[in-house]
Design a protein with these regions (language model features):
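Mature extracellular/periplasmic domains of secretome proteins
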Residues: 64-80, 102, 109
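Active-site-adjacent substrate-recognition loops and nearby beta-strands
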Residues: 94-111
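Active-site histidine-acidic residue metal-binding/catalytic motifs
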Residues: 1-68, 101-103
């Protein structure tokens, strides 16, 4: 069975990772956005019959090393040719109350 591993970027306790304050005083928080997107993707993929694993279900930030350990465990269990890992991030480019000039998006992959 093909397995899709979903990683939601950052946790509630990760400093930064948010927008400048909006007019109403709230901020866009990357951890909330990423978890909402991952939950929606997981629901749709499961409905299509895929085996889906959310790598980081916790609200707190999980270290990169622990994320890699969890991913590698699933890859050993299901086989490298049967797994796809997607990490969802928003890459907010705010600095306190000002936006920085970053633009665009990125996708990272490995050989194979």
């Amino acid at each position: 069975m093909f397995t899709i591993l979903l990683d939601n970027g950052h946790g509630v306790n990760t400093s930064g990772k948010c927008s400048p304050k909006k007019a109403d005083g709230t901020r866009f928080r990357e951890y909330k956005f990423a978890r909402t997107i991952v939950t929606n993707i997981a629901t749709k993929l499961k409905a299509l019959g895929y085996n889906v694993i959310i790598v980081t279900p916790e609200q707190e930030d999980i270290s990169l090393g622990e994320r890699v350990r969890r991913i590698n465990k699933s890859v050993r269990q299901y086989g490298a040719g049967n797994c796809l890992m997607i990490s969802v991030h928003a890459n907010a480019a705010g600095n306190n109350d000002k936006w920085m000039s970053a633009r665009g998006w990125s996708a990272w992959t490995t050989r194979g």
